[in-house]
Amino acid sequence: MRNLAAIIAFALLLPAFFEAVSAAAQTSEEGSIELVDPKVLRVCADPRNLPFSNEAGEGFENKIAALLARKLGKTLAYEYYPGATGFVRNTLNAHRCDVIMGMPQGDDLVQGTNPYYRTSYALVSKQGAGLEPIESLEDPRLQGKRIGIIAGTPPATNLAVNGLLENVKSYPLVVDTRFDAPAALMIGDLEGGRIDAALLWGPIAGYLAKHAKIPMKVTALVKETSGPRMIYRIGMGVRHSDQDWKRLLNKLIAENEAEIIKILASYGVPLLDENNALLAHQ
């Protein structure tokens, strides 16, 4: 009787056991499934962040995304969200889109693809102002100059190391791009003579200088001997579970390298080779 009771008790527990196993397996499976839309290239983007992206599709990331969509035979759709705190969490990781364009290689928030360009922070000055030959923030000709800097960006450290903070004008790093454009404001101050030089992320520097009211010189900061790194490889970001999707994007990047570089160059992005020299077309 004791054995029979044990058998009955075991039998009664079996359904619950298998249900638990099934649920665990399903959870594991869902964690590994790539939830990439098969018909639509869903891109996470900032709605007002030129030269990278905007809702009108005028940024170079918009153009690269359109190129990839054509190659994939997919329609293109966007999930727009201001590029501030919570961007990855509320877009890619919320499964509202499947790829973020323009992610620095090594960013742990996403799984990065192979890079599709290499660039650096840059120094922008007015043509004819005498600062054009400067190639490094260590140059003594910068002493006493009024320099614009986005707060908290790598060049700020180099300004401190080289004793250039006295006349620095700081602009905010984290803003809602729907309302504020600190980089454009900085270039406006440079045009108006309120600062003598501007330090900006290369793609922004090149684009704004290209569209400035007066001729500007953009110098990629590739000769710094101290401070944080100025040069970065830029790829795309996908979810950590999306291995096949990452491999497909890597294939597309390799196959369309020339077209991607052409798009970037048309926006004035300072493009560097592996020896830190500007690519020949620039």
Where are these regions (language model features)?
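Ligand-binding clefts/hinges and TM-proximal coupling segments of bilobed small-molecule sensing domains
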Residues: 26-27, 33, 154-175, 217, ...
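Bilobed "Venus flytrap"/periplasmic-binding protein-like clamshell domains
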Residues: 47-51, 55-71, 123-182, 203-204, ...
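Extracytoplasmic small-molecule ligand-binding "clamshell" domains
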Residues: 27-108, 177-180, 266-267
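Alpha-to-beta junction loops
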Residues: 73-75, 93-102, 145-146, 186, ...
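Periplasmic-binding protein-like
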Residues: 46-47, 118-130, 210-253, 267-282
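C-terminal segment of classical bacterial N-terminal signal peptides
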Residues: 13-22
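Acidic, polar ligand-binding/catalytic clefts
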Residues: 66, 70, 75-141, 152, ...
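Bacterial N-terminal signal peptides that target proteins for export
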Residues: 1-8
